[in-house]
Amino acid sequence: MTDLTRVVTEIAEEMRARPDRGEVATYIPELARMDPRAFGMVVIDADGEVAAAGDCDVPFSIQSISKVFTLTLALGMVGDRLWRRVGREPSGSPFNSIVQLEYERGIPRNPFINAGAIAVTDVILSRHQPREALGEILRFLQFLAGDAAIAIDESVAASEQRTGYRNMALANFMKAHGVLDNPVPYLLGVYFHHCAIAMTCRQLAEAGRFLAHSGRHPATGHLVVQPERARRINAVMLTCGHYDGSGEFAYRVGLPGKSGVGGGILAIAPGRASIAVWSPGLDAAGNSHLGRIALEMLTKRLGWSIFGQ
């Protein structure tokens, strides 16, 4: 057993024993069915060594983690023109808040809150029909993860469409301010479905490797994005990736990361590793409770915080 595998295994065992597990998301009915006792973790280092523990091969709804990949696609389509429609600043507000959007005339603070991700999805949809746009997002994730079996959990997507009233309000408000180009029903259909993509920790860690290695996926050698763009995506993940808990995550973990209300977190240790962790119980900000604790333990034990040991 390598040192990396030993550390990951020990952390998973410690997480399994903890009584504090957070609360599963209930506002999306399908997510409320998740087992709060589940925990999985995968770390893939620069040499391709995979350290895996726990429920690392159980698929879960990646939810807002998909926003990392839609941001990457949209930047590839329109470049820095994207930033005319969405900002790069932390919001300090809940991920589905409409208050800030009203003050700022329909321009979302960043691409990782719901309003910002809807605006990013609108850019992708402008190049395609809805089914084609969704297909491009899904194929991109399949390519990055090296696994064509990755698919959308249709029951989760349907659940979101039935109950996504706040997202409908956000989209209609932005549409009224001229921020969105496409019809809101089509746009939200794509948005709900890419948030409902299901992946395992192993697949997600593989998909994120290009961000740990200056935009190049080490498994294939493919340059996914230029090094400068990879750095900037990581920067937005660090400052905005955990909603109004982003500062706490940076303080405790010290890595770029993106969470989802399905309980997943994708974290990037630049030059070192791509990390995926999953535990469905959430904290008050909507981030995985045990996932954040596990990543804090990992960076402390390995000295991987970008701010130093």
From Swiss-Prot:
Intrachain S-S bonds: none
Binding site for substrate: S64, N114, E160, N167, Y191, Y243, V261
Enzyme class at the top of the EC tree: hydrolase
Reactions catalysed: L-glutamine + H2O = L-glutamate + NH4(+)
Pfam family, one: Glutaminase
EC code(s) of this entry: 3.5.1.2
GO MF annotations in UniProt: glutaminase activity
Keyword Hydrolase: yes
BP GO annotations: glutamate biosynthetic process; glutamine catabolic process
Keywords associated with the record: Hydrolase
Membrane spanning stretches: none
Quaternary structure and partners: Homotetramer.
Family, similarity comment: Belongs to the glutaminase family.
PANTHER family named in the record: GLUTAMINASE (PTHR12544:SF29)
Protein name: Glutaminase
Upper classification of the organism: Bacteria, Pseudomonadati, Pseudomonadota, Alphaproteobacteria, Hyphomicrobiales
